[in-house]
């Protein structure tokens, strides 16, 4: 019954996405992080103390998330096995963000096609951290493709990977790791100390899924008749062209598959950040690259599901 829950949850994410009014564990994790962070900042004042406080924050959030997830699943299964199955489906469904990522990217795509530049910039600002106020259409398009490529790892591939390793509770714990990084894992003066542990552990958690994305996205490129040879070549060549040890793997692979260049300098919080270019500019970026990148992400997600399900079947059984 475990594998059937995986596939049903995957289909639910594909069909429904994340309706904004539905309860979602990530919001609960965010509330817990905010509460604990406030308490730690009250108790810890030096940079050294905040670093240790950040480690405690990470341990508490990840530990509580795993324990509550495991306890909830155990309780539902004890009441009735089918109730446990439904609980597992719901948990996995909330972990996957493929449809949500697709919808966010297509919202910018639609604004670029039918709306104004200001609308496109505003919708892009909802999904990226860079300053979007001065971006033109090619830069907006490039930013959307980068976001789809990067988030294909932590939005789908990595949750499925940890689902294979330790079931829904471990996958939920991974989501807590990812949420911690997105909330406190910054290098700004405010978060550098308290978010140090969260940032490092997120890098560690995504290390293998990011490298698997090179293979999965290249295979996806072959299936959708994109340039899989360049996906493999550029994905390997430019795998370290990023300050993160993980982000460039998926970005470079998508850049190679589409034949465009990603990365480059951007503005963050009023400061110019010089980033290396990723990929070869065999042509100018086009609006059609947004749906093509989504297609790549969706196909790679399906391949990840099949690969991890097959691995689980061979090692554990149904």
From Swiss-Prot:
What are the protein's GO molecular function terms? ABC-type vitamin B12 transporter activity; threonine-phosphate decarboxylase activity
Q: How does it sit in the membrane?
A: Multi-pass membrane protein
Q: Where are the transmembrane segments?
A: 56-76, 78-98, 153-173, 204-224, 298-318
Q: Where in the cell is it found?
A: Cell membrane
Name one matching Pfam family. CobD_Cbib
Can you name a GO cellular component term? plasma membrane
- Asked if the keyword Cell membrane belongs to this entry, the reply reads yes
Hey, which pathway is this one from? Cofactor biosynthesis; adenosylcobalamin biosynthesis
Q: Which NCBIfam families match?
A: cobal_cbiB
**Name this protein carries in UniProt:** Cobalamin biosynthesis protein CobD
Native species:
Yersinia enterocolitica serotype O:8 / biotype 1B (strain NCTC 13174 / 8081)
Gene behind this chain?
cobD
């Amino acid at each position: 019954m475990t594998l059937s829950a995986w596939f049903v949850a995957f289909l639910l994410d594909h069909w429904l996405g994340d309706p904004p009014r539905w309860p979602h564990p990530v919001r609960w994790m965010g509330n817990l992080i905010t509460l604990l962070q406030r308490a730690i900042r009250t108790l810890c004042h030096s940079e050294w103390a905040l670093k240790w406080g950040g480690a405690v924050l990470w341990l508490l959030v990840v530990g509580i998330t795993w324990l509550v997830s495991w306890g909830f699943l155990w309780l539902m299964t004890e009441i009735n096995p089918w109730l446990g199955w439904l609980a597992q489906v719901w948990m996995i469904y909330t972990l996957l963000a493929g449809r949500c990522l697709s919808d966010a990217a297509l919202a910018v795509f639609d604004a670029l096609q039918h709306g104004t530049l200001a609308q496109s910039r505003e919708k892009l600002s909802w999904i990226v951290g860079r300053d979007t106020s001065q971006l033109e259409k090619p830069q907006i398009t490039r930013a959307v493709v980068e976001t789809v490529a990067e988030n294909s790892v932590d939005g789908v591939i990595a949750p499925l990977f940890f689902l294979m390793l330790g079931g829904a509770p471990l996958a939920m714990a991974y989501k807590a790791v990812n949420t911690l990084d997105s909330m406190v894992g910054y290098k700004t003066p405010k978060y550098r100390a308290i978010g140090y542990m969260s940032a490092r552990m997120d890098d560690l958690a995504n290390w293998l899924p990011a490298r698997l994305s090179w293979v999965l996205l290249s295979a996806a490129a072959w299936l959708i008749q994109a340039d899989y040879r360049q996906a493999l070549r550029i994905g390997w060549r430019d795998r370290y062209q990023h300050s993160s040890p993980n982000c460039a793997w998926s970005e470079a692979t998508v850049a190679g598959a589409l034949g465009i260049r990603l990365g480059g300098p951007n503005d963050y919080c009023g400061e110019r950040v010089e980033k290396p270019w990723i990929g070869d500019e065999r042509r100018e970026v086009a609006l059609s690259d947004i749906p093509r990148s989504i297609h790549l992400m969706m196909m790679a997600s399906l391949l990840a599901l099949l690969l991890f399900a097959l691995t689980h079947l061979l090692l554990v059984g149904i």
